[in-house]
Structure formats: C-alpha cells, structure tokens
Curated annotation (Swiss-Prot):
It holds the Pfam family RRM_1. There is a cross-link at residue 44 (Glycyl lysine isopeptide (Lys-Gly) (interchain with G-Cter in SUMO2)). This is Myelin expression factor 2. Residues 91-169, 224-301, 514-590 form the RRM domain. InterPro entries: MYEF2_RRM1 (IPR034630), MYEF2_RRM3 (IPR034631), Nucleotide-bd_a/b_plait_sf (IPR012677), RBD_domain_sf (IPR035979), RRM_dom (IPR000504), RRT5_SRSF_SR (IPR050374). GO terms for cellular component: nucleus. Keywords: DNA-binding, Isopeptide bond, Methylation, Nucleus, Phosphoprotein, Repeat, Repressor, RNA-binding, Transcription, Ubl conjugation. It comes from the Eukaryota. The keyword Ubl conjugation applies. It comes from Mus musculus (Mouse).
Length: 591
C-alpha cells in the first residue's frame, strides 16, 4: 500500500512538472494528459488540476495588477467556456439581513477576522443609494466558504442575525435582486449606488451590436465572454487569443473539442471587461480568419435571461386563453374606437374631397349668421373705418391667425384657396375692409344726408367691436379643439393635406396625440428595451427614459408614427408588468 502511495505521488509530481508556463486547461492539444485525482470522499475530481491552474494564473496576475483578481459576480464568464460551475466563482457566499448602515469595508474586515482571506465584497444598493441589506463575499479558498457557513450563519451583527448561503454561480443573489427589480454593477461601483452606464454613440449606433447587448451593457448586467463560430479547424486557443487580443485584454480562450480531442470549429473568449467583449463583436464579426468568416456574438451565459423576453411580452398583452387577434377597421389593421366613429360622423364631409368649410360638418362659416357674428361680413366693407368696427381686425389677428398657425402650421395660408368660397369672402371682408385706415377711399359712397345716422352708428359698431373682441378669445380657445378633432378624423395621406395648406399642416397633425407617457418603469430599463417593448403596438419614432443626475426616474415617453398606435399602446400595455412592476401608460398631453 505504501508503494502504491509513492507511485501515485511520483505520478502527481511528474504531472506538475509538465505544466506549461502559462496555465491552461488539460484539453488543449499538445499538453500531456494529467491523471485524475481523488477527493477526500473517494470521488474523482478531474477538474481539480484546472482549478489550481486558474488560481495560480490569478495569483500571477495579482502581482502586476491588483484589479486582476477582482471577480465580477454573476457574469458567469469564469466558467462559460465549458458550462461547468466549478471554478473561481465557487468560493462565494450570499449574505442577507445585513444592517442597513453597514459598509462593505466592515463586512470585509469581519469576514477576514472570523473566516479567512477575502478577495471580493459587494453590497447591493437601490437606485437612491440605500443599502438593500444583502451582498456577496468571495473568499480565496473553498474551505473558507465552509467555515463561513459553519461559523457566520446566524451570527449576530448589530442585533441582526446574518443569513449566509453558498452561492457558487450567483443564483441566490440574482433571485434576490430580481424580486426587487434591480440589477448589479459587478464591481464596487454598486456600493456607491447603481445607475445606467453612459455609452458613446459609436456603441449605441453600431449596427453590428444587437440592441439587447447594448441595453444589458448599459445596465451593467452583461458578461465578458463571447462565442466564436465557423473557425478554421487548425485554429487553436493560442491563435484565438492572439487574434482577439486586438480588442482587449483576453483572460481566457478556449476551443470546443469533440470526444476525440479535435476542434469543432468554435470557441469562447473571455475578456477583462464586458465592453471589450462588445468591441470584439464589432471588430471581428464577419471578418475572415484563414479564409473563413467568423461569427462572433455574446456567449449565452454572458447575457442575463430577464422576465421581459420578446416571446413572453407578446402573450402578456392578450387576455388569457386568446391566441391572437385579426385586423381591425382602422389604418393598417389597427382597431378603431367608437369615439373615432362618432367624431367622424359629426365632421360630415371632411373626407377625400378636402376641407370645405361650407360642408355639413361646419355648417358653413358664412351661414353662421348673427349667432357668431359672421352674418354678412361683406356688407360691412364700407363701414371699415367707423368706430369699433376697426377692432374687428383683432378677430383676424388675435384669434384666427394664432389658432390657425398653432393648429394648421405656420406656412402661408391662402384663405380664399384653402377654406373654400366662404372663407374667401371672409378674407376679403377682413383684409380688404377692416385693415384699412380711416379715409374716404375706404368709407365707400356715403351720402351727406345720412352722416348723422352714420355717426350714430359709431356707438352701435363700437359695441359690436367689443363683442367681436370677446369672440376673438373664443375663437382662440376654439382653435386647438378644431385641431384636435381634425388630427383624429382626417387621413393625413388624403384630404386637405394634399391641397394648398402645405407641409406645415401635415407635420403639425402628425406630431399631436401620438406620444405616450409611461410611469413606474424599472430603474434599470433602458430606452432601447422600452422601444422594443412598445414596437409591437406600432412603429416607434422615439423612446426616452427620463433621467436625473444620470439615473433613471422610473418613467419615460414613447412617440409613435400615428395616433392610432399610441391609443393602442394605452389599451394593451397599461397595467402589464415589467420586471415585476406594473406600468402606467397614458397619452402624453404635454407633447
């Protein structure tokens, strides 16, 4: 038995002497195969050697750069090459019920004193920078994890018993954070409050980077491992590392192999930082290596799986049991509401023939008569210079001009052409009659015999001017109402927008009523994810998350191409849950 132990020790010594200068896995071609070792319970642990190699690799890096051994929890990039859970991340514990006033330095000192050497500590905080009472601690060796579970679980800290669980892959911490709708930053930056990462336009507008990758990078949830496919079979891990080192600091490169140890033409590369992995996608996706185009994307383990996936979100807006809906009666198959049908009926003949003000919908402005004061404005032309009738100009300047410019665009409005003959006559009455100065040329043929009567009319017309002045403000208030009705009832591609009113009116009508305001959003939700979420309601022109001091305020706006899409979003998206938060969706009246 002693001889067997000696031979086993000799074999172990020989295996350690044959390790390469740069520690790598024993699966790389050219490296000698190491004999499996047995653990204390007799179970063979074939990966113990690779674990020790990786630890020695981290030890070497820590001498030159202290940040090299700062692990990024929950990114799963340490073990993404093989999908195994054994590696440096196995030495981590999740701690809850921490006093809210406790700092991460105090937790580190406590664990180092009671347990052993600590390599990483992180306390999670909410968007306001307040402690959530939980965090993670990572130890240098695995035996410290067992010791922490034995000695520190239920340890009384400032009157609160600590709850400690082993968390090798970060699942316990991830579930705790998902319940609160937050995410981690993966470094001590989260200890001073979490927030969205500001990315340069070169990343945000890069067509080679998928939107979900950008949003996860902004929120600090993205890992640092990429997956490379369609590699030439002669490409080894050294060549893979050499190539991708152009994009950043490569911590590990692996080639996927079959059971015979031959390359499968794919591999993974783990970088020091997540942004380097994103840069590698931008630089190398589609590029040729040995005449073969590489397919580069984020490794599946580096992208968090959230509860707002596209296939889940599509079914969440429909009533339970309903598989789908057909086309509605509105433009593009959108459902049309009863209120739209009623307004269309009131508007009368406002259709493809144009906006004729004499149509049944408006009742003919010229025929409104004394009720509104438009009666026969042409007949008042000769009285333009008398008394208060001159104030009739305020109706044109104050009411008609302001409301028309506000609701129909600021372009030149041809009254006689754009609004039919009724407004044409109104235009001649106002402009030709009222705008003139007092003088014989404008007074018309007034006989001397009626001068007394006409002077007496000054009082009457003065009072009439005051009435028209008050009517001016009424028309000013009526302007937005007409504009709001028109934008919902008139097809912007047909009708009067193709006429003399010009493009200003089309732009104006296209921008009102098509923006929504969304509240109670998760604080880690990005504008890209918000846009993607609401794209199923219609074409999204713009999406924005309201920010304050670089942090999300939990609300945002989405602007659609049409008002119908905005109304649809209010109907089917209001009340749904995103990351456990029930959102409130309504039309943005301030747009």
């Amino acid at each position: 038995m002693a001889d067997a132990d000696k031979s086993e020790a000799a074999a172990g010594d020989d295996g350690s002497q044959q390790q390469p200068a740069e520690p790598r896995r024993d699966t790389h071609p050219g490296e000698p195969e190491k004999p499996p070792r047995s653990s204390a319970n007799g179970v063979k642990m074939e990966n113990d050697e690779s674990v020790k190699e990786e630890k020695s690799d981290l030890k070497e890096k820590s001498t030159g750069n202290k940040k090299a051994n700062r692990f990024h929890p929950y990114s799963k990039d340490k073990n993404s090459g093989t999908g195994e859970k054994k590696g440096p991340n196995r030495n981590r514990v999740f701690i809850s019920n921490i006093p809210y006033d406790m700092k991460w330095q105090a937790i580190k000192d406590l664990m180092r004193e009671k347990v052993g050497e600590v390599t990483y500590v992180e306390l999670f905080k909410d968007a306001e920078g307040k402690s959530r009472g939980c965090g993670v601690v990572e130890f240098k060796d695995e035996e410290f994890v067992k010791k922490a579970l034995e000695t520190m679980n239920k340890y009384d800290l400032s009157g609160r018993p600590l709850n400690i669980k082993e968390d090798p892959d970060g699942e316990n911490a991830r579930r705790a954070l998902q319940r609160t709708g937050t995410s981690f930053q993966g470094s001590h930056a989260s200890d001073v409050g979490s927030g969205l990462v500001n990315l340069p336009p070169s990343i945000l507008n890069n067509p080679n980077i998928p939107p979900e990758v950008i949003s996860n990078l902004q929120a600090g949830r993205l890992g640092s491992t990429i997956f490379v496919a369609n590699l030439d079979f002669k490409v080894g891990w050294k060549k893979l590392k050499e190539v991708f080192s152009i994009a950043g600091t490569v911590k590990r490169a692996d080639i996927k192999e079959d059971k015979d140890g031959k390359s499968r033409g794919m591999g993974t590369v783990t970088f020091e930082q997540a942004i380097e992995a994103v840069q590698a996608i931008s630089m190398f996706n589609g590029q040729f290596l040995f005449d073969r185009p590489m397919h580069v994307k984020m490794d599946d383990k580096s992208v968090p799986h959230e509860d707002y996936r596209s296939h889940d979100s599509k079914t969440s807006q429909l009533p339970r049991g309903l598989g789908g809906i057909g086309m509605g009666l509105g433009p593009g198959g959108q459902p049309i509401s009863a209120s739209q049908l009623n307004i269309t009926g009131v508007m009368g003949n406002l259709g493809p023939s144009g906006m004729g003000m004499d149509g049944p919908g408006f009742g003919g402005v010229n025929r409104i008569g004394g009720g509104v004061g438009f009666g026969g404005l042409e007949a008042m032309n000769s009285m333009a210079g008398f008394g208060g009738v001159g104030r009739m100009g305020e109706l044109y300047r104050g009411a008609m001009t302001s409301s028309m410019e506000r609701d129909f665009g600021r372009g030149d409005i041809g009254l006689s052409r754009g609004f039919g003959d009724s407004f044409g006559r109104l235009g001649s009455a106002m402009i030709g009659g009222f705008a003139g100065r007092i003088g014989a040329s404008n007074m018309g043929p007034v006989g001397t015999g009626i001068s007394g009567s006409m002077s007496g009319m000054s009082t009457v017309t003065g009072g009439m001017g005051m009435g028209l002045d008050r009517m001016s403000s009424s028309f000013d208030r009526m302007g937005p109402g007409i504009g709001a009705i028109l934008e919902r009832s008139i097809d912007v591609d047909r009708g009067f927008l193709s006429g003399p009113m010009g493009s200003g009116m089309r732009d104006r009508l296209g921008s009102k009523g098509n923006q929504i305001f969304v509240r109670n959003l998760p604080f880690d939700l990005t504008w890209q994810k918000l846009k993607e979420k609401f794209s199923q309601c219609g074409h999204v022109m713009f999406a924005e998350i309201k920010m304050e001091n670089g942090k999300s305020k939990g609300c945002g706006t989405v602007r659609f191409e049409s008002a119908e899409s905005a109304e649809k979003a209010c109907r089917i998206m209001n009340g749904i849950k995103i990351s456990g938060r029930e959102i409130d969706v309504r039309l943005d009246r301030n747009a």
